[in-house]
Regions:
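N-terminal segments that mediate ammonia production and transfer
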Residues: 1-203
Length: 203
């Protein structure tokens, strides 16, 4: 008897992995990237991504914003928006290496920011709520701009592509963290786009 869709339970469809040091030992992203290779067939190339924790020890007290831009005009608008709401400690292009499997990359920038006590007092919300609201405002109101990571001492790295290629693209072998997670998408009814790759992160 041939079973039709919906008549058999498929417990999972994507590729996922995690590497965690319970002792807090640092490890490069190379191991988590390698762990995704045997699961290549569990993705279809429409989205792959990683999250690393403990990767920014020198900026551990600041929120690390990873942002995609459609163009430099979008970046100019967003940077003014950020300057009005945060102290920007550092702003830089996100490092990457060109790989033939990853194409059509948006502009990728990274900012380390601190909240301003005067604005926290004025809005009467705590630091985390303030950052979350600001990120959501950017992602819903600033066209051509998408904040895809905004936590402290952690970062998300994602793209349209297979996860093992995404890891090479973002040079994860050059980062060290105590915890890594990875995801390979297998979307069946949605298009692949850079912001829609997993994982998703807010704080």
């Amino acid at each position: 008897m041939k079973l039709l869709e919906g008549q058999i339970r498929i417990p999972s469809g994507c590729a996922i992995a995690a590497v965690i040091s319970k002792d807090g030992n640092m490890m490069t992203g190379e191991k988590i990237v390698e762990s995704m290779k045997p699961m290549h067939e569990r993705s279809n190339g429409l989205g792959g991504g990683f999250a690393g924790y403990g990767i920014y020890p020198e900026y551990r007290d600041f929120y690390a914003l990873h942002i995609f831009y459609d163009d430099n005009n979008c970046r100019t608008v967003c940077e003014q928006f950020l300057k009005d709401r945060f102290e920007i400690v550092k702003a830089e292009n996100m490092p990457f290496r060109k790989v033939p499997e990853i194409t059509d990359a948006p502009l990728m920038w990274r900012y380390f920011v601190a909240t301003l006590s005067s604005l926290l007092s004025a809005t009467q919300v705590d630091e985390k709520e303030y950052v979350a609201r600001t990120v959501m405002k950017i992602n819903t109101e600033l066209k051509g701009t998408y904040v895809f990571s905004s936590g402290k001492n952690m970062g998300v790295f994602k793209a349209v592509g297979f996860p093992e290629d995404v890891g090479v693209f973002y040079r994860l072998d050059e980062y060290e963290g105590y915890s890594w997670t990875a995801h390979g998408r297998y979307p069946t009814n949605t298009p692949g786009w850079w912001g829609g790759a997993h994982p998703f992160s807010l704080l």
